[in-house]
Amino acid sequence: MENLTEIESTMESLTEMESERVEQGTDKEIGSGEKRQDDVKETENENSGERVGEEAPVREHEDSPCLIVIEEGTSLASLEEVTNADDLPKIDDEKNSQFETSPHPSPSPSVALDTEEGLINPTAEDTVEENIVSSEVSSDILKDDGDAVEVDRDTAEVQEETANIPESKLSEDTGSPHHHADILMVQEKAAEEHDMIASGDHEEFPVNPDNKHSEENQSPHHHANNVMEQDQAAEEREIISPGEHKEIPANPDTKVVEENNDRIDEGEANNLNLAGDGSGAVDHDYLTKTELDKVLEVPGSETISKLEDRPSEHLSETSMNVEKELEMPAVEILPDNDKNSDVLAVGVSGDSDNVVSVLPASQTSSDRDEGMITVDAEPTEDMKLDVPDSKLVTDTTVDSTNNKDAHVEANTERQDNSSALVLNDANNESAPVKRVPGPYVASSNIKSEARGSGDLNNGVHKIVRTPPVFDGTMRAKRSFLLDDASDGNESGTEEDQSAFMKELDSFFRERNMDFKPPKFYGEGLNCLKLWRAVTRLGGYDKVTGSKLWRQVGESFRPPKTCTTVSWTFRGFYEKALLEYERHKVSEGELQIPLPLELEPMNIDNQASGSGRARRDAASRAMQGWHSQRLNGNGEVSDPAIKDKNLVLHQKREKQIGTTPGLLKRKRAAEHGAKNAIHVSKSMLDVTVVDVGPPADWVKINVQRTQDCFEVYALVPGLVREEVRVQSDPAGRLVISGEPENPMNPWGATPFKKVVSLPTRIDPHHTSAVVTLNGQLFVRVPLEQLE
């Protein structure tokens, strides 16, 4: 009660001082009062649409031409006396000085008394709720009274002027229990909202941009309000973003009416404007930036994820005038208080997509008019990304063509379309930041610092994608093999020749083999040219079978005194390049067509004498029998050589004359020809079947005479000990071969062929002969009938 008594005495003294000032300034404010009254009504209409989640504004009294409020300390009985009075225009100026303006909420905090006197110091949200409750109480009292209060224009102007005191408190009947309950509810709600502000989850209420303040030097109450406003504004700035924001200047629409500058100087007025407590209009973009910056500055891992948890109506409060919002700069660059601190610049565009760009603290953006941020960064080889504590899965895409742009997309389990990390190269200054809605980042340890050396921050994880390096094998593919089709350029450059020799040296060293570069007439041989010449002709086997070594040797322009060109260059290739060729073919790096004829594939240097003799014998055996030739239809025709000899003998007989010896030869030849023609008719009954893997390289031909079957077979590379012949009386002849060395140079493999003869045979008198040339002759006599 003592506090209430002191309050009433203070209010009476203030009322007297205000009434004196009002009487002096009434004539001056008549013209401006009308304009301000219209501004108050327009502000009420605008603010009623901006409030989200608040109670509906209290409607005006039907019979009242202006807004009616009551003074603090005025009871219901006194109000009835004033209402029932006949002389309404003569309302006391002392009471008019305490009238409030409109029932719409004012965002400025109401600080009428100090907290030391026992009352709670409410915040900006407290004032909003308190104004709404007070307006409802005032409206209920006026409705119960039922009488309209009419005030003439002069008195209305005085009320309008005195209502502009920013920190005046809505007066209610202090003795009413209803009022006391309202005060308790307001205090509890203020405490809850104060906790919400401290936790960073409160809503920002837009400030009326048309508020006008009338300041006076004679009101100690007003001076106290200014001091409390500054203290409370400082506390709000510390809650929202401690030490990170610029002082936002007041909007040009704010007007401060100062009549006397004796007690309140210009500095206090500037502090009132800079306090940001409702004394001036604040830009909607600033509110949006303030909300997002508060979320971004929460310490720990909640730095960016707070954006996702905020409801959508927060942004809707600040988007009343979208066109005006789009005209403002979309990005605010905050000052860097510390060169080592990281600044996250947030841009809010018209499509409500948030783009979070990582901007080093030492850099600022000059593209405010374009609504974009150009981030300077080093090339991607030096780019480092520090993500130590998150569930972040980073997918880095590096453009290999220019190796400049790197887009880092961060993927987490929580998906959201609000933000994406974008890094642009410093060389592409004119390129805008890509605004791609991407996955949400749940970590706060994503930093990008600018250093004097040009590197980004010294993070742990370094994302670098280096181009593939060609090793020796790939280089051999490119320069040693792929250029072999170009005629006239088989020699290659000196660098290619040196690289190829190094390749050969490493190849032999890996296999513990000696490699001596060949020399031709005292000079080093161009092995690269020899390699390309042979591989272009089809490889070693093809060149050997086609007898193209002389052609290969002639490309080196040997002297005319060299009479062994073919043998010399063939030896060079066998010693230096043959093993290398076999390796390339086995690895699939060199494609050489298989030879059409079965030719020797390799030569052992250790057994050059016997091996070459055996190889030559096999080659001659493959050329076919001189006595017989098998046609494509399976018939056996007369051998060309015998026919040729027969013709020669006949010519000689005509020239020389008939002699007994020539007649014998002639008869024998004629008999053989007739016998061969006779046997050819029965060859259709002979079948040859492979048992096991097919061996097409083994050729078998069968002829029938009067008393036996003659079987001619080609088994190149096999000797007598490696060939086996079996027969049975039913007419089956089995020819099998088993080479001693499976890795023989002729490619001979184990085989087994069954020849089915049309008649029964005598297996006890069957004989076989194998020559050194790989020819097999088997004589199978017919079964003798007794």
Swiss-Prot record:
- InterPro entries from the UniProt entry: A-crystallin/Hsp20_dom, ARI3A/B/C, ARID_dom, ARID_dom_sf, HSP20-like_chaperone
Please give the chief subcellular localization of this protein.
Answer: nucleus
Q: For this chain's UniProt record, which GO biological process terms are given?
A: regulation of DNA-templated transcription; regulation of transcription by RNA polymerase II
- Record-linked SMART domains: ARID, BRIGHT
Keywords from the UniProt entry: DNA-binding, Nucleus, Transcription, Transcription regulation
Database matches in Pfam families: ARID, HSP20
Q: Does the keyword DNA-binding apply?
A: yes
Q: Where is this region: Disordered?
A: 1-182, 199-251, 395-420, 606-638
Which residue numbers delimit the ARID domain? 494-585
> Would you tell me the Gene Ontology cellular component terms?
nucleus; protein-containing complex
Question: Where, per UniProt, does this protein localize?
Answer: Nucleus
Q: Which residues form the sHSP domain?
A: 686-786
- Specify residue ranges for compositional bias: Basic and acidic residues: 18-64, 87-97, 141-156, 169-182, 199-219, 234-248, 402-416
Q: Which PROSITE patterns match?
A: ARID (PS51011), SHSP (PS01031)
Membrane listed as a keyword: no
Amino acid composition bias (Low complexity), ranges on this chain? 1-16, 130-139
Gene Ontology molecular function: any one: DNA binding
Q: Tell me which family the UniProt entry assigns to this protein.
A: Belongs to the small heat shock protein (HSP20) family.
Which protein, by its recorded name, is this? AT-rich interactive domain-containing protein 3
Query: Gene name?
Result: ARID3
